Regions:
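Conserved catalytic alpha/beta core of Sir2/sirtuin-type deacylases, generalized to analogous enzyme cores
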Residues: 177-178
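Helix-hairpin-helix
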Residues: 144, 182-195
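Generic structural marker for isolated residues within well-ordered, non-membrane alpha-helices
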Residues: 41, 169, 183
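Surface-exposed, charge/polar-rich loops and edge strands
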Residues: 172
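Noncatalytic, basic helical substrate-engagement surface that gates or grips nucleic-acid strands
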Residues: 2-140, 148-166
Length: 195
């Protein structure tokens, strides 16, 4: 893969670091999501030399989907924070918002495109970009969301930050016994506890 377009599932990658990275600022604020995202993105850029980096952010798409199906994502467990103390629990939501705001601002100073489409989940935006805008371009989707496996084809791969590996259509077929073109249909029959 030479100079692919890299499309990052912003909140998915941020939350991995927010929950796992206990980094603190000099003021005592938790900054693990911010620090981990920036460091991780730097490593990915070194490894894949993308021609373009796009970060897709969530913007309330869940509300739209929940109006159609109230149980949408109701099976999700709350984020498990890797902390050595419990004092930050009431401030977690505020800190999360603060870190995302700092991250968006920092990324706006870099040669990175950020996309936020009103009433759309990042997954939907990523799917549109990979299938329609960059369909004839090599792409790497950065996310641990298996729903995005449906986008994997000859031109598109998925990098899983948790597994630290690039996933292609052969890897999906080998692991699940399902082609990427049938992955979503199979998940409909099997079910998805995270949704």
């Amino acid at each position: 893969m030479s100079n692919p377009v890299m499309i990052v599932d912003g909140l998915n990658v941020f939350m991995r670091h927010f929950c796992a990275n206990p980094s603190m600022s000099s003021n005592g604020d938790h900054v693990g999501g911010f620090v981990g995202f920036i460091k991780g993105l730097g490593i990915l850029c070194e490894n894949f030399s993308p021609s373009k980096v796009i970060v897709a952010w969530e913007s309330g798409g869940n509300l739209r989907k929940r109006s159609v199906m109230s149980s949408h994502k109701s099976g999700r467990r709350p984020a498990s924070l890797n902390r050595y103390y419990d004092d930050d629990i009431p401030a977690t939501s505020t800190n999360h918002t603060m870190q995302v705001s700092l991250l968006v601002k920092a990324l706006s100073n870099l040669p990175i495109t950020q996309i936020y489409v009103k009433n759309c989940e990042a997954d939907d935006v990523i799917g549109y970009l990979a299938r329609y805008i960059y369909k004839d371009t090599e792409t790497i989707v950065v996310s641990s969301d298996r729903d995005l496996y449906q986008l994997i084809d000859e031109q598109s791969r998925q990098y899983s930050p948790g597994q630290k590996k690039l996933i292609d259509k052969e890897a999906v077929l080998e692991k699940f016994g399902i082609s990427t073109t049938n992955f979503v249909t199979a998940r409909c029959f099997i079910g998805d506890s995270s949704d």
